[in-house]
A protein has these predicted regions:
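Short intracellular "coupling" helices and adjacent cytoplasmic loop segments at the cytosolic face
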Residues: 5-19, 108, 116-140, 144-146, ...
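ABC-type nucleotide-binding domain
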Residues: 351-592
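Transmembrane helix-loop-helix hairpins at lipid-water interfaces of multipass membrane proteins
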Residues: 39-95, 175-180, 292-295
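An intracellular "coupling" helix at the cytosolic face of ABC transporter transmembrane type-1 domains
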Residues: 33-34, 127-128, 144-153, 157, ...
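Membrane-integrated ABC transporters
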Residues: 1-53, 68-81, 98-103, 107, ...
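A hydrophobic transmembrane-helix motif
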Residues: 55-61, 87, 91, 157-200, ...
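Cytosolic ends of transmembrane helices, especially the final helix of ABC transmembrane type-1 domains
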Residues: 229, 236, 260, 307-335
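Hydrophobic alpha-helical membrane-associated segments
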Residues: 48-52, 56, 86, 90-103, ...
């Protein structure tokens, strides 16, 4: 399995480009640099498999000349030409299959690799990046843009490269037979280049506009789906429908303008090439009239010119799709080359995290905010201690938890874990020592068993059952027809809030973590569910360093220490009874 994953990771190809801009075509070559051999083999087999179209033109001309000028040719030539064309046509079956096979291997691998690399990069990007980037837009990049890049790759390998091969061979054959006719053919190139340059910038901009509108629409649809319970509860369905309709209207209008521009491009190229084809017919006929060629040669050159027109037309016809593909390449670079990754780059891997924390003058400010949400925050926590943070909304409680998890990095001050600066720790190793239970825990689509053992496929049944018992979850499992193998639905939608919380606690327990983080873990529960979850949490917290954020002050009564926060600073600290005895800020919060 590890080998498969490594071959799908293109991250190294973009390491030196982080934070820079890379041209789409350069990006495409990076993606295919490990598949040059496959591309070369597909081009070779295309050249062989496509040979009938060139040979048939020559054979047709030869047959016409043989029957038109019997005094100059023998019937032996007739039969040789027939044998050649039959053999050349039959070989198309194996060579065409090999041509497509090599293309498919390369394209399928790049498509899977690009999606895998985007997902890897998303896992590395900071939470602030994900906060700024709508999930629907990211989904659009991974699905729609990669699909467009896949289509671009196929157009390049199955249209552009074959067309280029056709042009080289046909012009070469024409040059071999008549340099005058070859020169006439080459005159078509400047007009083709002019057409592309004339339409290129307009098509690129309109494709960009359409792509951005589709990303915005994807974000709106994603948000609308998530908000259905709220909108329905308030009777605001029409408001959401109008929002999506407005986004769709923008896509419709800009898409229509793009379609019209592509129509102008297609019709202009068709008119130009038809005029050239008429010119070729009269030019070669005039040369035959002067005695420079035989009648069959007119047919051959006309056939060659049709091939040239077909090749150039195929390039120009797919050009709008190429523009879309290159715009999608530009789109994925917004993710692949982003520098907004997690800031911690430490490499230290302690054997075991004990759970001692020291915050020294820590300060943090959110992007776009004009004040520090934490200011000179200082605190020391002993291993196995339970510390609860309370205070008004915006006082910095949840920010502290995000700093402990490593989602954020202090702008100033330091955090030490077991005496080691947090910046020197490997975040992956450190987070394996954490368990987090949130107010709204995310469950994955799947069974209860899969959610509890997430990331631990080889956990023993004994440990699993122990975690279920400690999480007070057994009665829930016994009440379900499929027990542990019951599907929870999307985001756990088939379960109650209390049931989801206990599954989250079981998921934490089965990992045997050293540090527990509880963020409003019971605030959304009714009294009965809260009692069950509270009992499970007590099992979870035993002997472990625990950080709690809660608005219900009754839930922090048993904490070893309660830290009262206000405007990013510690204003009180002590046990529940000590703080009540002070009759300070905690006392006020308790009596609100």
């Amino acid at each position: 399995m590890a080998k498969v994953e490594s071959t799908l990771d293109y991250s190294e190809a973009f390491e030196t480009e982080q934070g820079t801009k890379i041209k789409p075509f350069k990006l495409l070559t990076r993606l295919y640099r490990d598949h040059v051999g496959k591309v070369a083999m597909s081009a070779l087999y295309y050249t062989i498999k496509a040979s009938p179209i060139w040979v048939l033109s020559i054979v047709t001309a030869n047959i016409i000349n043989i029957v038109s000028y019997p005094d100059r040719h023998s019937m032996r030539e007739f039969w040789i030409n027939l044998a050649v064309i039959v053999v050349v046509i039959i070989q198309n079956i194996p060579t065409h299959t090999l041509h497509i096979s090599y293309i498919s291997k390369a394209v399928r691998h790049v498509e899977a690799g690009l999606r895998s690399t985007l997902v890897r990069k998303m896992q590395q990007l900071s939470l602030s990046y994900h906060g700024d980037m709508n999930a629907g837009r990211l989904q659009s990049k991974i699905l729609r843009d990669v699909e467009a890049i896949d289509f671009l790759s196929r157009q390049m390998l199955m249209t552009i490269i074959p067309a280029a091969i056709n042009l080289i061979i046909v012009i070469g054959l024409t040059l071999y037979n008549s340099w005058i006719v070859a020169l006439f053919f080459v005159l078509m190139a400047p007009m083709s280049i002019f057409l592309v340059r004339f339409f290129r910038s307009k098509m690129s901009q309109r494709n960009r506009d359409v792509r951005r509108n589709i990303e915005e629409m994807s974000g709106k649809v994603s948000e609308t789906v998530e908000m259905i319970p709220v909108t329905r509860a308030h009777g605001l369905e029409e408001v959401e429908i109008r929002k999506v309709d407005s986004a769709l209207q923008n896509i419709r209008e800009k898409g229509h303008r793009l379609d019209v521009l592509e129509a102008y491009f297609g019709s202009s190229s068709w008119v130009v090439f038809q005029l050239f084809q008429v010119g070729c017919l009269f030019f070669t006929a005039y040369l035959a009239h002067l005695g420079y060629m035989e009648i069959g040669d007119i047919v051959m050159y006309q056939s060659f010119f049709n091939m040239i027109i077909g090749s150039v037309s195929s390039i120009l016809n797919v050009y709008p799709n190429l523009v879309k593909g290159f715009e999608s390449l530009h789109s994925v670079t917004e993710v692949l080359l982003s520098k907004e990754t997690e800031e911690y780059k430490g490499r230290k891997n302690p054997e075991r995290i004990q759970g001692a924390y020291r915050f020294e003058g820590v300060g943090f400010q959110y992007k776009g905010s004009d004040r520090h949400v934490l200011d000179e925050f200082t605190l020391e926590v002993k291993p196995g201690e339970t510390v609860a943070f309370v205070g008004e909304s915006g006082s910095g409680k949840s920010t502290i938890l995000n700093l402990i998890i490593g989602f954020f990095k202090p702008q100033f001050g330091n955090i030490y874990i077991d005496g080691i600066p947090m910046s020197e720790l490997s975040m992956r190793k450190y987070r394996q020592s954490l368990a987090i239970v949130l107010q709204n825990n995310i469950l994955f689509s799947g069974t209860i068993r899969e959610n509890i053992t997430y990331g631990l496929p080889h956990i023993s049944e004994e440990k699993l059952q122990q975690a279920i018992w400690m999480a007070n979850l057994q009665d829930v499992i016994d009440s379900l027809p499929d027990g542990l193998d019951t599907s929870v639905g999307e985001h756990g939608g088939r379960l109650s809030g209390g049931q989801r919380q206990r599954i989250a606690i079981a998921r934490a327990l089965v990992r045997d973590p050293q540090i527990i983080i509880l963020d409003e873990a019971t605030s959304a529960l009714d009294n009965m569910s809260e009692r069950h979850v509270q009992q499970a949490m007590e099992q979870l917290m035993k002997g472990r360093t625990t950080f709690i954020v809660a608005h219900r002050l009754s839930t922090v009564k048993n904490a070893d220490r309660i830290v009262v926060m206000k405007k990013g600073k510690v204003i009180e600290s002590g046990s529940y009874d000590e703080l009540l005895g002070m009759k300070g800020e905690f006392y006020k919060l308790k009596n609100l």
